[in-house]
Amino acid sequence: MFWFKNVMIYRLTSPLSLESSSLEEQLQQAKFTPCSQSDMSKFGWSSPLSGSELLHFSQGKQFLLVSHKEDKLLPANVIKKETEERIAVLEEKEARKLKKTEKQAIKDDVVAMLLPRAFSKHQFTAIWLDLDAQLVYVDAGSSKRAEDTLALLRKTLGSLPVVPISFALLPSEVMTNWIAKGHTPNWLNLLEEAELKSFDTDSVIRCKRQDLESEEIAQHLQAGKFVTKLAIDWENHFSCVLNEDATLSRVKFADEVREKNDDILKEDIAQRFDADFLLMTEELKLFTQKMIEEFGGIKERI
């Protein structure tokens, strides 16, 4: 199961409805295929469930997809060295300087020669569509990685009107008040890690193994710094770092959560996957609702 390690939440700005069989047909049109000897990169959909031919997993109005990107690794310095050597040999042989187009052609030949021997890097990105709430969750640690997968889904479906979720209150201000005014929600425990930032001077302080209720931290907040990253623990659920843009990083589900379905035999992969997906999505739905409450509700963009 793809237990999310990072969470970026997007809101659908127009209602989206999906039907399993038609979605599968669309996904199959963009199915991942490995790089051939002449490909630098390939991007498409892979099956979320090991051993299944289906390119999506669904429970009611909940859909899980997994994008698969393969990139051939060709070190730029290797290409540069080989290209320069070939150019030097040819220029000496012909007693003239090569044109820009000729140099590019040589570089292209070098890349074509090296590609079949290049190693591949594979990247899998899970995306969960909660169509009950009209929200999209992406397991990505960067906006670019999330946007790449959303762009693939947009191309697959023909349309995908989404924006990053935003709230009436700024998360950085709310997190700052949790520490400065002792307004931490009773369901949440602060861990000893945070990032404080001054928006006036761009100065940044990163704290680890630091009591966030100490006088030292209080002085930084009084001086006008805001909390932009905060390590938190939702007891018996999961821990994570909550960021100023309401994204979550380093999500780690509690053992109590991950062990709930241990009564299902490991051999029954499909049943365990189904149960774990339900478990994870319910946890993230609950946390999203708590964020909505703490941050004053979802902000509707014009």
Curated annotation (Swiss-Prot):
<dbReference type="Pfam" id="PF04381">
    <property type="entry name" value="RdgC"/>
</dbReference>
<dbReference type="GO" id="GO:0000018">
    <property type="term" value="P:regulation of DNA recombination"/>
</dbReference>
<dbReference type="GO" id="GO:0006310">
    <property type="term" value="P:DNA recombination"/>
</dbReference>
<keyword id="KW-0233">DNA recombination</keyword>
<keyword id="KW-0963">Cytoplasm</keyword>
<comment type="function">
    <text>May be involved in recombination.</text>
</comment>
<dbReference type="InterPro" id="IPR007476">
    <property type="entry name" value="RdgC"/>
</dbReference>
<comment type="similarity">
    <text>Belongs to the RdgC family.</text>
</comment>
<protein>
    <recommendedName>
        <fullName>Recombination-associated protein RdgC</fullName>
    </recommendedName>
</protein>
<dbReference type="GO" id="GO:0005737">
    <property type="term" value="C:cytoplasm"/>
</dbReference>
<dbReference type="GO" id="GO:0003690">
    <property type="term" value="F:double-stranded DNA binding"/>
</dbReference>
<dbReference type="GO" id="GO:0043590">
    <property type="term" value="C:bacterial nucleoid"/>
</dbReference>
